[in-house]
Amino acid sequence: MVPRDWWLEPWEKAAILEFHAGHLTEGYRRMAFMMLDADVVAASPSSVYRVLRDAGSIKAHKTRPSKKGTGFQQPLAAHRHWHVDISYINVAGTFFYLCSLLDGYSRFIVHWELRESMTEAEVETIIQRARERFAGERPRIISDNGPQFIAKDFKDFIRICEMTHVRTSSYYPQSNGKIERWHKTLKGECIRVKTPLSREDARRLITEFVAHYNEVRLHGAIGYVAPADRLAGRDREILAERDRKLDAARQRRKAAREASRPAG
């Protein structure tokens, strides 16, 4: 069998397995781009998958394609859509309200607050603080039909701020799935894992997780770049650099195999 340029060398396979051992909670796709960005191994997600599968470190499985957001017109730039949602956070048996705002284009967490109550006026305050962080932006606010968002005062607030507001259908909430997914990720990877013992502890943990989520964690829905990079417009440069690294690795493997062939 003739070796292909994308076939990994033994040291590359070993490096993948070693990296995986230190990142067991990461999926193979995210891990492939993490290694690529960190100059550990330049390998495609499919190559990483095969290495892990052959080593018995991953199981083949089929996932059903999600219909979340099907038919929903996605924003083409940052700060066009801000998704807002309220979720409950269980802290040592006491439930607090978490309100988050997420930029629909970059998945960047624009602002969040953890409170004992969450009235319509408090939601206004949270959105206003988010607007102060990004002065001059007038995003479309996307929410569910919670009581805070259907109140007349909230409608007046949106009008005064010269924004627009869209509420998801009661029978089709998928267009707000981005923020719902964020809350699910936060609870699954932070709150339930680290079990905060007080509201102050929860705020500290959420602050740390949001920083990691925005600045470091690679997001699959935006090409496995960090939300902050997408927000700042650095994603194209990152993707181009990855392509360059993958091509250079293929050329290096090809040259190494040609050099190892017996002279004839």
Predicted regions and their residues:
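Basic, flexible linker segments flanking DNA-binding modules
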Residues: 1-81, 173, 231-235, 240
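C-terminal domain-tail junction helix/linker
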Residues: 2, 161, 185-264
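RNase H-like two-metal-ion nuclease catalytic core shared by retroviral integrases
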Residues: 6-7, 143-145, 151-158, 165-188, ...
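Mobile-element integrase/transposase regions
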Residues: 11, 41-42, 46, 50-102, ...
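Mobile genetic element proteins and their domesticated derivatives, centered on retroelements
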Residues: 16, 31, 48, 85, ...
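Short amphipathic alpha-helical interaction patches enriched in hydrophobic/aromatic residues
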Residues: 20, 35, 39, 169, ...
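Short hydrophobic alpha-helix segments
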Residues: 112-113
